[in-house]
């Protein structure tokens, strides 16, 4: 869970900052329309695109070449971290529309004189972004990182959709892809199925304790980043 959340959060923070900077500082044809599309992604329920996204990664680009079969991947990119990482790289992951909006609003408040002075000193667009804009964006970048990490840490929707094989703890080949929220969900379901009336209180206590243990790393990270 830490590995997946950390990778996705780092990628999403950088990609959303890059996209937000483009929307805030560059005037190009279709800027307004494309930003509206970004806002619309914040309003669409995730279930609206569930089947489409699953099929895209189940039959990904290289599926017809036989490469996946050679690697032992019989279901495309399903049951790997690849779908979540690809969505993060393209700015289409969970809540990325919100992150782009946050970064755009922040960069709109950055004085244009900073960029103009860097251009006079011979900096290009990318060098200006990396050496001038990113250093002054650290507080906002940390905010986006915390939000992205915490949402990925507690996610069950995308994990269950792209890694359905990780839902059973009995499949040792899938243990690497198991995340804590899905483990907690598995425990909950097992208890609900097997618990008797006399054991209900015990089942609830175990479930609540497990839920508390899951959020402890988030609390520690928040206190550290504060």
Show where each model-derived region lies.
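A structural signal for multi-pass alpha-helical bundles of membrane permease subunits
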Residues: 1-226
């Amino acid at each position: 869970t830490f590995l997946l959340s950390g990778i996705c959060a780092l990628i999403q923070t950088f990609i959303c900052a890059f996209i937000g900077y483009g929307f805030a500082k560059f005037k190009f044809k279709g800027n307004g329309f494309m930003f509206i599309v970004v806002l619309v992604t914040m309003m669409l329920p995730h279930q609206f695109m569930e089947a489409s996204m699953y099929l895209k990664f189940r039959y990904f680009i290289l599926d017809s070449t036989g490469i996946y079969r050679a690697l032992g991947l019989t279901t495309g990119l399903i049951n790997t971290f690849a779908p979540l990482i690809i969505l993060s790289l393209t700015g289409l992951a969970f809540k990325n529309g919100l992150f782009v909006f946050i970064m755009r609003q922040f960069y709109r408040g950055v004085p244009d004189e900073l960029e103009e002075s860097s251009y006079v000193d011979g900096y290009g667009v990318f060098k200006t972004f990396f050496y001038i804009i990113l250093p002054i964006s650290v507080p906002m970048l940390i905010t986006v990182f915390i939000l992205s990490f915490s949402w990925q840490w507690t996610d069950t929707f995308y994990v269950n959709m792209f890694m359905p094989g990780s839902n059973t703890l009995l499949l040792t080949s899938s243990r690497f892809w198991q995340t804590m929220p899905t483990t907690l969900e598995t425990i909950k379901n097992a208890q609900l199925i097997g618990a008797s009336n006399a054991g209900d209180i015990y089942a609830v206590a175990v479930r609540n304790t497990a839920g508390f243990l899951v959020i402890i790393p988030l609390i520690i990270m928040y206190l550290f980043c504060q």
